[in-house]
Curated annotation (Swiss-Prot):
It is found in: Nucleus. GO terms for cellular component: nucleus. Residues 1-23, 297-327 are annotated as: Disordered. Residues 10-23 have a biased composition (Basic and acidic residues). Zn(2+) binds at C47, C50, C72, C75. Induction: Induced by gibberellin. GO terms for molecular function: DNA binding; DNA-binding transcription factor activity; zinc ion binding. Interacts with RISBZ1/BZIP58. PROSITE patterns: ZF_DOF_1, ZF_DOF_2. Transcriptional activator that binds specifically to the DNA consensus core sequence 5'-AAAG-3' also known as prolamin box. Can activate the expression of genes encoding for the seed storage proteins glutelin, prolamin and globulin. Functions synergistically with RISBZ/BZIP58 to positively regulate quantitatively many seed storage proteins. Functions synergistically with RISBZ1/BZIP58 to positively regulate some metabolic enzymes, such as alanine aminotransferase and pyruvate phosphate dikinase, that are expressed in developing seeds. This is Dof zinc finger protein 3.
Length: 373
């Protein structure tokens, strides 16, 4: 022992961290891969097929850095480094093929030619024949079926309808007035004459509404002369008349039927003396007919007096005056012309205050028909 009892210090050994072999191999592999990748990127390998240097790196096959894949621009083929070469023809990597072009050419040849733009489609013969028959067929005649609805329009337009291109259409253009032109062009004789075409002339040509008419404005001779069924109401003016009721169409509702009866049957249109159906000079209403004949007895106690009463019924005698004036008549009991008389002129010479008013012709008829609609 050394003297003095001093102890020597213990020397400490440095600790060395030992790594496992697996870790060492991993580090080495990573360094090798990095170096190989850098070399591949820096230098392009030659193509194993054509030995061309025009190659490029594409990607890693199967995401493995040990299998880089290249592409040769010269022969247009791919290869993988370290793998086997496939027997791929030149240009095998190109997706353009002759099969697609051939199929497109055959499809274009097989497609039918497009129709011309201006060519019209073929017309079916059956359809064309049906259309021609429909155009040639005449409409069914229904005279005065819509008379209350059509009359105000005809009156407001002067009994004419406007058409395109500035033309005027008369009532003869419609199917319900088919025989209109013949009736107006060839009026009958007897009782009087007129050079103008009136609305009653037009109505005479419609489906037998005024059959047996003598000629325009006057229907028969003086006082029932000429054997006409519809005798004139006055002597001298020659344009008063009694409108007979036409066959009523099947309207629904009693208001329309009552209006049609009141429009055509219940009252007379006239301007002066002379009986409605004269059998002589007494001027009674139903003197020439007897009982049970058409037209039936007109309504009202003062309108149903028999023959021989002196003609003081609807129209008074030629020398009478004012017995049946407008005091008990509705608006549509009127004279044919406003100048010939107002609502009802009581006699050929007499007349009352209503005759001097000069009411507009057809105004009352228009008001009544409008009220029925």
């Amino acid at each position: 022992m050394a003297s003095g009892g001093a102890l020597s210090p213990v020397e400490e050994k440095p600790t060395v961290v030992k790594t496992t072999k697996a870790e060492q191999h991993e580090e080495e592999a990573a360094v090798a891969v990095k170096s190989a990748a850098e070399m591949m990127k820096k230098s392009s390998p030659c193509c194993p097929r054509c030995n061309s240097i025009k190659t490029k790196f594409c990607y890693y096959n199967n995401y493995s850095m040990a299998q880089p894949r290249y592409f040769c621009r010269e022969c247009r083929r791919y290869w993988t480094q370290g793998g086997s070469l496939r027997n791929v023809p030149v240009g095998g990597g190109c997706r353009k093929s002759k099969r697609s072009s051939a199929s497109s050419a055959s499809a274009s040849a097989a497609s039918p030619p497009a129709p011309a733009v201006g060519a019209a489609p073929p017309v079916v013969p059956a359809l064309s024949s049906a259309i021609s028959k429909l155009l040639q067929s005449e409409p069914m005649a229904a005279p005065c079926a819509d008379f209350p609805n059509v009359l105000p329009t005809f009156v407001s337009t002067g009994f004419e309808l406007p058409a395109a291109a500035g033309d005027r259409l008369s009532l003869g253009s419609f199917g319900a007035f088919g025989n209109l032109s013949a009736a107006v062009a060839a009026p009958g004789g007897g009782g009087g004459s007129s050079t103008t075409t009136s609305f009653m002339d037009m109505l005479r040509g419609v489906g037998g509404l005024f059959d047996g008419v003598g000629n325009s404005h006057q229907m028969g001779g003086n006082g029932g002369g000429g054997g006409s069924y519809y005798a004139p109401l006055i002597t001298g003016a020659g344009n008063g008349m009694l409108m007979p009721p036409p066959p009523l169409p099947p309207f629904s509702g009693s208001l329309m039927q009552h209006g049609m009866q009141g429009l055509f049957a219940n009252h007379a249109m006239g301007g002066g003396g002379g009986g409605v159906m004269n059998a002589g000079e007494d001027g009674s209403v139903m003197a020439g007919l007897g009982g049970g004949q058409w037209p039936p007895a007109l309504g009202g106690a003062d309108e149903q007096q028999g023959g021989g009463d002196g003609g003081e019924a609807v129209m008074t005698k030629d020398t009478g005056g004012g017995a049946s004036s407008s005091a008990s008549r509705p608006d549509y009991f009127y004279g044919w012309n406003s100048a010939a008389g107002g609502v009802v002129a009581g006699g050929g010479i007499g007349g009352n205050a209503a005759a001097a008013t000069g009411a507009t012709p057809w105004q009352g008829l228009i008001d009544s028909s409008s009220a029925m609609m």
